[in-house]
Amino acid sequence: RAGVSAGLAYHHFGSKDGLVAAVVEDFYDRYARIANQTFRGETWAQREVRRVRAVVRFFLEEPFTRTLFGPLGRSSSVMQAESACMAMLIERGACNIAQGQMDGDLPRQADPHIAAAFVLGGLRQCTSMALNNPANPDVDQLAHAIWVLIAQSLGLREGSKS
């Protein structure tokens, strides 16, 4: 259908699964570049509000998100590629949450790795749910709704100037 040889995927990627994994890895590389930016703000919370908004914007504006978070996301090759990419994002997120704990914005009771996995999984699922809605989701509204849940689940302290 794309006007190329059926053997192209096998020649360059070894298999159809290899091609799919390469596309998924490219998506997650672009996601990681956005999520791992240094955001401006006086407090951890101010920076994270900006990070959540940027990630939500990426998910909503990236055409492949609907496909990846939909039926394709259940294939074993996608889940395998996604797992490796998410492990890197969780590691970076854990460092970020640990910094929020050291700054006194977050309580130290939560394990940073578990908290990062929870936040990233919730962000993905909330976006997936919003994309299944017939109306196009609004970036700001969805980002705000997700941020409220993140802040509450992590126990963001009231006096943290968020």
In which residue ranges do the predicted regions lie?
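Short linear capping/connector segments at secondary-structure termini
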Residues: 69-77
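Helix-turn-helix
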Residues: 1-18, 22
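Amphipathic alpha-helical packing segments from all-alpha helical-bundle domains
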Residues: 29-32, 57, 77-103, 113-117, ...
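Helical hydrophobic small-molecule/effector-binding pocket
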Residues: 46-70, 84-95, 120, 151-159
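Transmembrane helix-loop junctions in multipass membrane proteins, especially transporters and channels
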Residues: 130-137
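Conserved hydrophobic residue
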Residues: 106-107
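Hydrophobic alpha-helical connector segments
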Residues: 22, 33-64, 112, 116-119, ...
